[in-house]
Amino acid sequence: MKKLLTLCSFVLLSLGASAQAFDPHFGIGVGVGTTGIDIDASVTINDYIGIRGGVDIMPKIKIDADVDLKTDGANKKVGELKQYVNQINAYLPAGKQISANDFNQLPEKMKLEGKLNNTTGHILIDIHPFKTSFRLTVGAYFGPDEIIGAYNKEDGFFKPVNQWNNAIIESQQPGANPAFTNLVKNNNLEMLGAKLGDYFITPDANDPKNNAEANIKVNGFRPYLGLGFGRAVPKKRIGCQFDLGVQFWGKPEVIAPTYDNGTFKVESLKAGNSGDGDDALKTISKISVYPVLNFRLVGRIF
């Protein structure tokens, strides 16, 4: 970051030193690369300084995944729990019973859909230290803080899961029928969800929509540092630019609904020492920069 501030200072000094050589030209361009489809407008102050501003449209790519649905500690799967539904319902009032039909149709895995959401805007300053096409570039990208969202693919999928989880919570309440409590305890019946590292992921048992989602969050403001070839506005009618650099978007966070120690909450997940998916949490938390590799065609207006 100190290097970025140093370069920004160099830009300001260069602008001041070259004020008498002010010779602006304007252009528009389109590009493609790791930031998506890039559309921007550009201006050159002189042979040494160029400025670009625009938008980077990232396609909303969707990825499907299957996650095992099982209980927290005992790791019982759905098929092992179906035999207990009628026994549990015997201790519940009509409004709180588990739908045996819905629960019996519940699959062993839940289908999730992940969606990329990373369309950004940018303001970049190109610095040509040698009056050639080679340049250094500083600036910033601006985008959403939630760049990836994961949702249950089937709306209302968690209805029988929530009914089951509410029943387990009911058995643990003070004043619950002792026979009900013993049924749950003696058979190691626990809440249903998915394990991710040291966390137990499950929807809010009181959510009327019976859905759940998780997100990966980064900083919306992302300083940029890079290098490349080509001018913001070419000296001829048509030119090209090549960019190689990184966005500094901070330490990513995985935000998900959890139920641990009897409390439901939406929290930032931290990598632990064990559990399914813990390696994924560790990897995600280490990716503090986003690589930028773009190729751009630019046309000179005047």
Model-predicted regions and their roles:
Residues I39-R52, D56:
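Feature captures outer-membrane beta-barrel proteins of Gram-negative bacteria and organelles
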Residues F26, T35-I39, I49, T119-I123, ...:
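Hydrophobic, lipid-facing positions within transmembrane beta-strands of outer-membrane proteins
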Residues V32-G36, V55-I61, A140-E146, R231, ...:
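Transmembrane beta-strands of outer-membrane beta-barrel pores
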Residues I28-V30, A41, G53, I125, ...:
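Membrane-embedded beta-strand positions of outer-membrane beta-barrel proteins
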Residues S42-T44, D126-F130, G228-P234, V298-F302:
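Structural signature of outer-membrane beta-barrel channels/translocons
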Residues I49-I51, T132-L136, K235-I238:
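Repeated loop/turn-to-beta-strand initiation elements of outer-membrane beta-barrel proteins
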Residues H25-V30, K60-N118, D145-G220, G250-S288, ...:
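Extracellular/periplasm-exposed beta-strand and loop segments of Gram-negative cell-envelope proteins
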